[in-house]
Structure formats: C-alpha cells, structure tokens
Amino acid sequence: DVDIWKNQIVLSRTKISGEFTDNWTRLNLANALDLNGTKGDISKLINYRDSVFAFQDHAISQIYYNEKEQITTESGLAVQLANSNKLDGYKVLFDKIGCSNKWSVCVTTHAVYFIDDENKSIYMWGGGQEAPINITDKNGFNAWIRKALKENEQWTFDNFITYFNNSTSDVYFVNNDNCLTFNEIVNEFTSFYSYENTPYLQTMNKEFYMFRNEVNGVTMWQ
C-alpha cells in the first residue's frame, strides 16, 4: 500500500517471457528495503547506467541490488559471487536535493533531469557522485521557474512534466501554461514552444508526436 509504506522498496520476481502468472505481481515482502522516512516519500525509482536510484522529497539515493563480489580461489582463479537478486541496502548520495514530482523526472542517454519543488530549481545529473547541476541558476532562469512552479501534486499532471525528444536532443519542461526547452547539444535553454497543456509527447522512428486534450476530444500532432 503506497499510502502506508511510502519509504519501502519491495522486489518482485523476475519476469519471464510466456509465463502464465505475471511475476511482477508476486512481491516478496521478505526482500524489502526501508529508506529514511525523514527525507520524504519515495517519488520515483529509475534505472540509469546499470544502477538503480531512488528520489525522495529531500534526498537521492543509490539502491544496491544483486551486488557482485569478486574473490580469488586457492588456485588463483577469479570468481564472482552474487547475492541471488537481493536488496543489499542503499547509500544517500545527496540529502539537500530531491524530487517530489515523479512526472518531472526524465532519463536521457546523456543525463537525468528533474525538478526540485522545495528548492524551486531544475537539475541535470549525470548519475554519479558529483552533485546535480542547477541549470536554472546556471542559465538565468531562476526567477522564471520560481514563478512557474505551482503547489506540487505529485500524483497528478497539474505540475511540470518532462519529456525528451531524442531526434533533436531537446528536453521539454511542460505544464499547463508553459513549455521550456533545454537542448543537450548546446547545453542551454533554447526556446519556449507552444506545447503547453500537453499531457503526452513521444518520439517514434525519429518522428515526434504529441497528444493534446481539445474541446472535441484528444488530438494527435506530428
């Protein structure tokens, strides 16, 4: 129950092609991990560069899962030992930066982007030990994001949603009134587009599509 166990991660069984019972619905409560509740709820889990990270309101942590250890036998042969798909613990990487709006987290091939409502900033993070970069402060958009951010409702689309267009390397920060674009190639905010109030954008086969709520229903644009 996400309303009760807001700081707990539980592993399912491994999904197998052609299985009769969906293993993702079979949770093993003996294999669970509780994060520090003082850092807020877990809003988002991501898999980035072969590592799992958890976002809380006031922290970003790395989740240690199925960690491998290399040992050397008496014969000098190197052997890797794994812990059979178990959660090994976690490490808090940053405790003054976090994210409560899961829809604002966007993973690209270059970085992870997210909005910290508490600090009222947009961050770009490379997924390592180095702290995320506040790209709104760096690029002169601090006043704009503070005005554009609304009271966060993390389970709705009322606040910002972040999307990535892999054909142009553009990252879109979209809410009901704005669409601010950051380009990964030039590493700058480049423009405001008329994609505001767009609940879904997607790149397929190098073509960019968006779905919008109109008076007569949902429309698709290319």
Each model region followed by its residue ranges:
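Long, low-complexity, polar/charged, intrinsically disordered or flexibly structured peripheral segments
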Residues: 1-30
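Homeobox/homeodomain signature
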Residues: 14-17, 25, 35, 50, ...
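Solvent-exposed, flexible loop/coil residues
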Residues: 28, 39, 193
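A short beta-strand motif characteristic of beta-propeller blades
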Residues: 28-35, 89-95
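Long, low-complexity, acidic Ser/Pro- and Gly-enriched intrinsically disordered regions
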Residues: 35-36, 68
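A general structural signal for stabilizing positions within well-ordered secondary structure
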Residues: 36, 43-44
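Beta-sheet-dominated scaffold domains
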Residues: 43, 49-51, 57-222
